[in-house]
């Protein structure tokens, strides 16, 4: 098992979450209707993202004994890898305008890059970062090189 195909984000309000991500520029495909979606898939390159109602996602994990829905930092961050420091700034401003909360203003990082963090409407942490030496493949996915 050496790939990750889909990340599903449980959301408290799928309609509001959908609007938020549309404002960030994501193209989506809705199963159901716009006012009552069942699931929403992002039509992004690379690993796909989906939005699904949080309580329904917990039941999907275990219908008889769904996991508790927690608040706070889950130990997971999602990342958008930018191609310039200016793009980092632009993405963070766009996220904030769409309703995100900036958790860390963009700054030079201890690993030599530049980045910041925001939380989306459901509290998921998103890193927006840039590295001078980063290279991207034809799908705009970061190339991870062996050292």
Predicted segments, located by residue:
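Vicinal oxygen chelate
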Residues: 3-12, 40-41, 64-147
